[in-house]
Swiss-Prot record:
Keyword Transcription: yes
Domain of life: Eukaryota
Function: Transcription factor required for protein utilization and degradation. Regulates transcription of major secreted proteases including a serine alkaline protease (alk1), a metalloprotease (mep), an aspergillopepsin (pep1), a sedolisin (sed2) and two dipeptidyl-peptidases (dppIV and dppV).
Species assigned in the record: Aspergillus fumigatus (strain CBS 144.89 / FGSC A1163 / CEA10) (Neosartorya fumigata)
Gene Ontology CC: nucleus
UniProt protein name: Transcriptional activator of proteases prtT
Any GO MF annotation of the entry: DNA-binding transcription factor activity, RNA polymerase II-specific
Amino acid sequence: MMHIQTLRKITILDVQDKQRCLSTNQNVPDNVFQLIACWCYFPPFLSIAKIKPLIALKAGISENPVLIGCRRIKMAHCPYSEAMTRTTSVEDVKFEIPAWDNSNVDVADGSGRPESSTSGDTIRPKGRIRRSMTACNTCRKLKTRCDLDPRGHACRRCLSLRIECKLPETAERFQDNASMWSDATAAIPSIEERLISLERSMTEMTSMMRRMMDRSPSISGSSVSMLTRSGITDETASIEGSQSSSFAPRPIRLLQDLQSDFTGEANVLPADSRSLGDLFTKGIIDPKLSQKLIQLFVDHFGIWISVDNPSDIHNELRATDPLLYSTACLLASRYVPGIPLSVIHAMYLQIRHATVNVLWNKTPLKHETLQALALLALWPTAVQKETPMDSWLLSGISINHAIISFDFLNHAPSDLIVDNDMVAKLRVWNALCLTQLQSAIGNARPFHIQQRYLEHCPRLLEHPAATFEDGKIVAEIQLYLIALKLQNFSHRMRLGDFEYEEIERWKMEWAHLLKLSLWYCQLLLYRTAMRFHWESEHLISEILRNSRLILSKFLLVRFPNALAFPDQIYYIVGYAALNLCDFSPMDPLIDQVQTFLLHLSPNEDHIAYRFSYTITELKRRCATGPNPHNVVKGAFGDTRKLSMGQQIPFMNPLMDTMMGEYGGLEHLIPEVPPNSLPDMLTSVAGELQAFRTAIL
């Protein structure tokens, strides 16, 4: 075998000479066969320049009959014979180009021209494979690479130059275009249907707006411009002047009016209540009883205003801030049944008088004073014999004081870090905002807190000390904001929707925290929609369903927890019971709730006791079939009733107006004879002394 170094000395011209000998049937020198054998054994050691002539030489050997019978090339011993032959016989040996060879090499003859013809069955080396043309015209002209996505319709160069990308048509691109056009063709009918539906909806809305304008000729352009100049914007989150506000139900006002009508009380304060002094300094509540009341207050009410320890409310507060101290004792008195009603009544009158004076004090108010105002706004009906404090007015004025007193409200929510001091202020702020929302939606009154102030409410949850109750308050604030917005969009109520996208989004985040408030808001929305769809059976069924859910949930609460409920919970339960009386007076849940409320009430002045009687009386009158034309004067206010000229269908249910001509309830609620202030204080002192002897 010829040495590898000797093979490298063979030039291309020598091999080409041997090829010419083959073409003329001349004798081939021995070194040619040696070269071919070395190529079979050591192909990697040959350069590509020497391989090209060997390819042509191989083809010449297969054509020369003299060389076919030559046994000097022992292909059976060649390790690359499997890649070069198709059969094992020498006669049928056909040389193939190995896998490592370049199949696109052009074979040239001695003249330097590529060989273009073959003879017989000889497989000659193929020429350059013509690749499919995929580059666009621009890239081909520039002779650059065309960076094209296989599924794209333009290359990056054309996109960057913002010119048309002309691509050659290929089978794959043709199939993509065909599928795209087929999809577009299939979507055309659905698009046309949607357009027709939109046109129909626009026509209905236009006709509805025209009817509304015809029914309300008093609304002129000047009045609209006046509202615009008054500064009512979306930022204020106000609903004042909304047309649908006259259609919204007023559950708080309704329950208060029904209670007044059924009990026959005048709902006025005694004329001498303003001259009431400090009952604590007169010895009405001694230190031992006050300590017990403060401990009860911390256990059941302190979480609302960040009071976790009785030491947070010092005895010195009697002199420095008597309002918070008195409010704490008043709220805790419901947990001590032995305290005489006259004592509680005297405490309540003193607190009302102190509250009036505090609201007009010099600003800014102390933090303890704002805490007391927040508690009074949450529990305004501690005593039911007089007109309860208006929670909407009380919380509204307190919010204005809080804006002045709390510095963090004057900054963006992201500017400050929530520390312990800010947590205490945020709890008071959230309680005031929640009370304002509850009273606004419960009395169908406007809500004026600006959105930039409301954005501070959820910041309380960023602090590690945030509690489960803090999350419930934040969730309830957001829920009432959504309900208030929906309730006062007349077009949403006129559509009679049963599901609201805004509430569904709220459910995904907060539904696990609140149930009663959610059902209550849905109940209010359905009652509002019923003003425009009074014959809707689905609305009636939804009203009954939500009312039953509220009452069933309330019947599961524990007695200690029920006494600490804010007054809003009792309004929710009372309104749900009245709805059942209106549509299904024989529902057994009505009697169950009435009995449960009577069991919960610590005394006759508690809101649960009064609502229990109101529900019982309303059920009795609904079951006897009342005359809807005999209404109680002022039960809901003449300004709320719709005139016949409006021609808007609405229902005149028992929930809005109740029957009159009923006397007092001396058999159930004992009458307290009016006494002068000195006599009342003397009697209170005597009763308290007897209570101390028996209890303490």
